UniProtKB/Swiss-Prot annotation:
Enzyme class: oxidoreductase
Residues that hold sn-glycerol 3-phosphate according to the record: 107, 135, 137, 190, 243, 253-255
Active-site positions on this chain: 190 (proton acceptor)
Purpose of the protein: Catalyzes the reduction of the glycolytic intermediate dihydroxyacetone phosphate (DHAP) to sn-glycerol 3-phosphate (G3P), the key precursor for phospholipid synthesis.
Organism: Rhodopseudomonas palustris (strain BisA53)
Keywords, comma-separated and alphabetical: Cytoplasm, Lipid biosynthesis, Lipid metabolism, NAD, NADP, Nucleotide-binding, Oxidoreductase, Phospholipid biosynthesis, Phospholipid metabolism
Pathway linked to the protein: Membrane lipid metabolism; glycerophospholipid metabolism
Protein name (database record): Glycerol-3-phosphate dehydrogenase [NAD(P)+]
Binding site for NADPH: 15, 35, 51, 107, 139, 254, 276, 278
A cellular component annotation (GO) from this entry: cytosol
PROSITE patterns: NAD_G3PDH
Family in the record: Belongs to the NAD-dependent glycerol-3-phosphate dehydrogenase family.
InterPro entries (alphabetical): 6-PGluconate_DH-like_C_sf, 6PGD_dom2, G3P_DH_NAD-dep, G3P_DH_NAD-dep_C, G3P_DH_NAD-dep_N, NAD(P)-bd_dom_sf
Length: 328
């Protein structure tokens, strides 16, 4: 694949802005597309996102609300929520050139279809090259230029390598992979485990319980991933264990902070605080997919039951602790 000189980022939220900053620091010409008029105005006039205050856009970043303008880039980062990805790609598809890499930067599974992000891209834009970017990374850290490592996966190794090279800068190190499914599974599954870890923290059950929850959550992640064809080394890498470790340890993670609120006794609606916790959408889908493959995922079951109002936090914790003893 030829080198990538221009990158478009669709989505001017915190993560989209951070990735636009990174691409600009890597020497690419960057177009940042924002659908929301208020945030687009803020990005254009103040050179700052409403969702990432205090971070000034790099001079190389051009802000636009014209999707056709963004579609002219050599590669496009799709930094929109998982549940609206299909809508965005469907609008984008007629505007892009053949074999344009479209990189999903959301971690989730589509409701109703059980499709992963790259599968949605392949269906909605069949002439594009689907890819996924995932790993332990908070927008604020990336935007500030703090050291971060992620994984970029595509079916074609040359495409994955070219994308990693295009996004590589002094503080942002992308590893490349061809295990697309493994990278996607890790990102989606850890969201649910982060909610569980947050519940433990919010309930003040202690560091020992949090370590146990995170470790057993990783066991579920590996079980689920291997059942759906992920490579074991991917599960142990940045997009699996790395992302899980980060998101199960800090309120910077929306899923962890959402779980903390549930652990403190807040309702699901109140705990959301108007912010997206992708794990809340993913949990029931993940559970359906696990059952289809006869994969045992008790932590995921507990999270889904809490979210659906089928059990209380204390009852779910009690059920996990009274499961039959077994070999590790």
């Amino acid at each position: 694949m030829t080198s990538i000189s221009s990158i478009a980022v669709l989505g001017g939220g915190a993560w989209g802005t951070a990735l636009a900053q990174t691409a600009a620091r890597a020497g690419r010409a960057v177009t940042l597309w924002e659908h929301d008029a208020t945030n687009a105005q803020q990005l254009q006039s103040a050179r700052e996102s409403l969702y990432l205050p205090g971070v000034t856009l790099e001079p190389a970043i051009k802000v636009t609300r014209d999707l056709a303008e963004a579609a002219r880039a050599d590669a496009i980062l799709l930094v929109v929520p998982a549940q609206v990805l299909r809508q965005v790609v469907t609008s984008l598809a007629p505007l892009i050139g053949a074999q344009t890499p479209l990189i999903a930067c959301a971690k989730g599974i589509e409701h109703g279809t059980h499709k992963f992000m790259t599968e949605i891209i392949a269906e909605a834009a069949p002439n594009a090259l689907p890819a996924i970017l995932s790993g332990p990374s908070f927008a604020a850290d990336v935007a500030r230029g703090l050291p971060t490592a992620v994984t970029i996966a595509a079916a074609d190794a040359a495409v994955a390598q070219a994308l990693a090279q295009a996004m590589n800068c002094g503080s942002f190190r992308p590893y490349h992979s061809t295990d697309v499914r493994g990278v996607e599974l890790g990102g989606a599954t850890k969201n649910v485990m982060a909610i569980a870890a947050g519940i433990v923290e919010g309930r003040k059950l202690g560091a020992s319980a949090l370590a146990a929850m995170t470790t057993r959550g990783f066991v579920e992640l590996v079980r689920f991933g291997t059942a759906y064809g992920a490579r074991i080394e991917t599960m142990h890498g940045l997009s699996g264990l790395g992302d899980l470790t980060m998101c199960c340890s800090t309120p910077q993670s929306r899923n962890f902070s959402f779980g903390m609120a549930l652990g403190r006794g807040e309702s699901v609606a109140t705990a959301a605080h108007g912010k997206l916790a992708e794990g809340a959408f993913t949990a029931p889908v993940l559970l359906e997919m696990a059952r289809a493959k006869h994969v045992e995922m008790p932590i995921s079951e507990a999270v889904a039951a809490i979210l659906e109002g089928q059990t209380t936090v204390d009852a779910a914790i009690g059920a996990l602790l009274t499961r039959p003893l077994k070999a590790e």
